[in-house]
């Protein structure tokens, strides 16, 4: 298991944010990912338009995951239509 930071950006509209964050938690649980912390960063302007949105709700996760499952996890994240974008960063052990 390795430690990762996961930065996610969701639409600011509550009816899009809530299902998106629920889908994210469900996928992480399906893959046996342990969420060490979840820190909302709030709503911010995007540097450029993503999926016709100019504002996003940022949430930072510190997670522990199996590196062998990261490619499949990435593929599943792409199916979350409510999530604007995301980034995984592996942390030093």
Swiss-Prot record:
Q: Give the Pfam families listed for this entry.
A: Ribosomal_S6 (PF01250)
Presence of the UniProt keyword Ribosomal protein in the record: yes
Report the superkingdom from the record: Bacteria
One GO BP on record is: translation
MF GO annotations: rRNA binding; structural constituent of ribosome
Provide this UniProt record's keywords sorted from A to Z.
Ribonucleoprotein, Ribosomal protein, RNA-binding, rRNA-binding
What's an example GO cellular component term for this entry?
A: ribosome
Q: Is Transferase found in the keyword set?
A: no
Looking up HAMAP family in the UniProt record yields: Ribosomal_bS6 (MF_00360)
Q: State the family named in the UniProt similarity comment for this chain.
A: Belongs to the bacterial ribosomal protein bS6 family.
NCBIfam families noted in UniProt: S6
* Biological role stated in the UniProt entry: Binds together with bS18 to 16S ribosomal RNA.
The molecule here is called Small ribosomal subunit protein bS6
Species for this entry = Treponema denticola (strain ATCC 35405 / DSM 14222 / CIP 103919 / JCM 8153 / KCTC 15104)
């Amino acid at each position: 298991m390795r430690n990762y930071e996961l930065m996610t950006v969701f639409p600011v509209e509550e009816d899009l944010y809530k299902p998106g964050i629920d889908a994210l938690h469900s996928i992480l649980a399906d893959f046996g990912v342990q969420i060490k912390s979840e820190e909302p960063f709030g709503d911010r302007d995007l540097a450029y338009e993503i999926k016709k949105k100019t504002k996003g709700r940022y949430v930072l996760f510190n997670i522990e995951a199996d590196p062998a499952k990261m490619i499949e996890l990435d593929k599943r994240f792409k199916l979350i239509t409510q999530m604007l974008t995301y980034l995984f960063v592996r942390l030093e052990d």
